[in-house]
Structure formats: C-alpha cells, structure tokens
C-alpha cells in the first residue's frame, strides 16, 4: 500500500528534477536564441568579460548589466535584479556579501557602508548543484543574476494545457498480477529574452 501511494510523488519529484536540469543545461550550453545570437553575448550586454567568484564588485557588475538593459527601441527598462543563481560552494559567500553591513573600501576607509546590504531582503540566493554537475569537474562554473520577470523574462517553462504535475493512470492487465502505470508530463523550455539574466563565467571551485 505504501508503494502505491508513494509512486505519484516519486515521479513528480523526478519530473521536476529533470525540468530543473534542462533549465540549467540551457544556461551552461548558452545556445543561440531567437535573434541568432547566443543567449549570453556581448551583443546582448548580459555577459561579464572575465570570470570570477561572487564578490561585492562582481555582483554589482552583474546587477548593472540588468539595470542598463534597453527595450528594442533603445529605451531604458532598468530590469530589477531579483535572483542570484550560484553553484554549490558560493552560498556562504553570498551570505557574507549581502549580510555584512560595514566593509573596508580602498580609498574610502574602514567601516564603510556596504552598498549591497540594502539588497539582503531583495535578492534571493539560489544555490544549485546542477550547475556544478553540468559544468564538469575542474571547469569554471558560471553564476547568474536574474531579474524580476515583471521587467524582463529569461527562461520560461511551459506545460501542455497548464498541467504542471505528471498525469498518472493505473490499470490492471487481465491474467497478470499487479498494476500497470502510465505516467506522463509534457513541457517545453524556451529562452524568451536575454534582457532578464546576466552571466559571470565564474571560476573553478
């Protein structure tokens, strides 16, 4: 009985994990999108030139990429940063960056206000192990800053008929003990806009 009741939950979890991996694979693979240019590219103004670990300076640089974005007519849209997506290993560092109120700044002095402290309740840090796995051992692991989708989108997951959980059908086959399970879920992942996300190529961890 326990197995029968657990099966739907197990498959739902597996489906979500698969979708999650496919989303991050797009971020890692950096494919060409609707305009024929890679998702992250200098032409899109959403790519940091040299990779580095998250720091106050590198996080500010990625956030500014979003804030400097413009619409197709060249008007500023100032995409508000909302998510910082980092591989496992940077979560503690991000806590230090956002939760430290006072820092030492060269040319200004010690006990200087941390400009990012005000974002501690505005930015959501997502520490994702799929980035580590997909980047591969010994390789630089990128990290990302994504904006509020009210201003600009980035990747979008769509489900057939809006069904976000697997459909499960259980049946019995005559002459055979046990059950037959039909379990399915239809989805698609699209990079709908480059303006809603910025990439730092990162470094090895």
Report each predicted region and the residues it spans.
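Alpha-helical scaffold segments that mediate packing/assembly in large oligomeric complexes
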Residues: 1-6, 10-70, 122
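A glycine-rich phosphate-binding loop feature that marks nucleotide/adenosyl-phosphate handling sites
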Residues: 29-33, 80-87
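Sequence/fold signature of self-assembling virion shell proteins
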Residues: 42-53, 57-68, 82-83, 89-205
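Short gly/pro-enriched beta-turn/loop segments at secondary-structure junctions
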Residues: 72, 77-81
